[in-house]
A protein has these predicted regions:
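N-terminal nucleic-acid engagement/recognition segments and initiation subdomains in replication
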Residues: 1-154, 166-173
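P-loop NTPase catalytic core of nucleic-acid-dependent motor ATPases
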Residues: 129-241
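AAA+/SF3 P-loop NTPase mechanochemical coupling elements
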Residues: 235-241, 275-293
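Conserved AAA+/SF3 P-loop NTPase catalytic/coupling segment centered on the Walker-B
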Residues: 243-267, 300-305
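Structural recognition of the conserved hydrophobic beta-strand(s) that form the central parallel beta-sheet
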Residues: 246-249, 274, 287-295, 311-312
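Conserved catalytic/switch belt of AAA+ P-loop NTPases
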Residues: 259-282
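A short helix-turn-beta junction within AAA+ P-loop NTPase domains corresponding to the substrate/partner-engaging
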Residues: 300-319
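C-terminal, non-catalytic macromolecule-binding modules
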Residues: 314-335
Length: 335
């Protein structure tokens, strides 16, 4: 009261700050604020009310100006999360990383030390507003590639590192179609890759490693390995709108109901769910393509049909660590 803080703001703060207090916090503050002659008699050191009459709290403009001095910010459309890049001490631009609670708390602490009364929720709200520029990691990567020369079959060379027991040319043809469809689904909301690409072979034959290395380092974060195949969760639905490839290990462990769910997932064009702590459902495009590994040739048991699966039994795979992928060539051709 004496420092000029509005009763409603002070009461709201106290209720949250002393949530475990059994007494009537609001009644205590009503009693204190009855002494109207004391209101605003003491200056708040280093802090003065804003002209906008917002009870002395930092305005949106104040917070945005402060954030401009701290780092670069962007909103990742694939992950639905804010990212930040902090400049190094030498002035070099830093790499973008996802914002976490510790970083937001640090921003609040730094701004408070500058003499600003700021709500941490206001900082979060601004970071999740139009203040942060939109960033699409897939557009950023693919538009930066050099055009394909129209001749060199980079995808064919990549497919040739997998040696299958069936006709090699058939495998290479289907892999090329699956890979091109996976890239198309990143950019066209009406395109969904309906087929599930599966490598069958013994353990230790580089199946998962080869699939994992399909994505370039810049997009490696968008490869997801699903090892718990016993159930399909809400998080699995969100993964359809976030990742490029979802790899299901040991898919022979899938039960009949899970197989049916996965078949339905492959044709689902959008994900319409509410994320944890979000206020509204999000209507997000299905961008992921599914792949998998198994050592069981007889993993398909659906008598109604298996046209969504592209299974190939391998005899061997060239060591992915000694046979690196020509990412620029492969993806300029696929794009």
């Amino acid at each position: 009261n004496a420092y000029g803080v509005a009763q409603a703001s002070a009461t709201q703060w106290a209720v949250k700050r002393f949530a475990d207090y059994d007494g009537d916090v609001a009644a205590i503050f009503r009693s204190c604020y009855q002494h109207t002659e004391e209101h605003g008699r003491r200056p708040l050191q280093g802090r003065t009310p804003n002209a906008g009459g917002n009870d002395g709290f930092a305005s949106v403009e104040d917070i945005e100006r402060f954030l401009d001095t701290q780092a670069r910010f962007r909103y990742n459309e694939a992950t639905g999360k804010c990212e930040t890049a902090v400049a190094g001490t030498d002035g070099a631009k830093g790499e973008y990383t996802e914002i976490d609670d510790r970083f937001v708390n640090t921003l609040w602490s730094r701004m408070s030390k500058q003499g600003k009364t700021v709500r941490i929720n206001d900082i979060r709200a601004i970071l999740h507003s139009e203040y942060t520029v939109l960033f699409n990691p897939f557009t950023d990567y693919f538009e930066g590639l050099k055009p394909w020369d129209g001749v060199t079959d980079h995808i064919g060379r990549l497919a040739a590192t997998v040696h299958v027991k069936s006709e090699q040319s058939v495998f290479e043809g289907y892999f090329k179609k699956w890979l091109v469809a996976s890239i198309a689904s990143l950019f066209d909301r009406e395109t969904v890759n309906h087929e599930i690409f599966v490598l069958i072979g013994p353990q230790g034959s580089y199946k998962t490693t080869w699939l994992n290395k399909l994505l370039p380092p810049a997009l490696q974060r968008y490869f997801y390995i699903k090892s718990n195949n016993n159930r399909i969760t809400k998080d699995d639905m969100f993964s359809l709108a976030e990742f490029v490839f979802i790899c299901m290990e040991e898919i022979d462990e899938l039960g009949a109901s899970e197989l049916n769910q996965i078949k339905a997932m492959t044709t689902q064009k959008v994900v319409n769910e509410r994320m944890a702590y979000a206020h509204y459902k999000e209507h997000r495009a299905h961008i992921a393509s599914l792949c998998g590994t198994t050592n069981n040739v007889q993993f398909l048991t659906d008598l109604t049909g298996n046209r969504r699966w592209l299974p190939f039994e391998i005899s061997s795979i060239d060591n992915p660590y000694t046979h690196p992928v020509d990412y620029e060539g492969v993806y300029s051709q696929a794009y």
